[in-house]
Design a protein with these regions (language model features):
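Long, hydrophobic N-terminal alpha-helical segment
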Residues: 1-43
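Heptad-repeat coiled-coil alpha-helices
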Residues: 32, 36-39, 43-46, 53, ...
Length: 145
């Protein structure tokens, strides 16, 4: 697990945000393709064997599978950069740091201009606290010894 200073996490944010946006796009694409597949399957069931266009079904499956692979890659890229996706649907990420000799998370949500909050590892989004001078003076990005 990588530990970040606030400055390091902020510096990593543009790359991580790009990967997060890619993940959200590919998740949407895979869900859309799966929705079309589900509707077609339901239509076949409801009609007792309606005709379907096999090439269209193959194309939808390929689109879904390609999007799922791209989604997984984007999530892997976020992890490689050192961030942790906490909630993909709302674009919530954490970066680990140390504050007063304990592990805490620098917390960022898609749409926020900068990393401005932190929380304990078990507190989650609802436990977010603003980064203040006290936090800045007592946090560091070094792993515990």
């Amino acid at each position: 697990m990588r530990y970040f200073t606030l400055a390091e996490a902020q510096q990593a944010l543009p790359e991580v945000e790009r990967h997060l946006r890619e993940a959200l796009f590919h998740k949407s694409q895979s869900q859309e393709a799966q929705g079309h597949l589900d509707k077609t399957t339901q239509r076949v069931r409801d009609s007792g064997g309606a005709r379907v266009n096999p090439s269209e079904m193959l194309s939808l499956r390929a689109r879904r599978d390609t999007s799922i692979s791209a989604l997984k890659q984007a999530l892997d890229d976020i992890e490689e950069a050192g961030a942790v996706v906490k909630d993909l649907d709302i674009g919530l990420l954490d970066f680990m740091t140390r504050y007063r000799d304990r592990d805490v998370c620098l917390c960022w949500k898609l749409g926020e201009e900068r990393i401005g909050f932190w929380h304990g590892p078990d507190e989650g989004f609802r436990g977010r606290k603003p980064i203040d001078q006290e936090f800045l003076q007592h946090h560091h990005g070094e792993a515990p010894h």
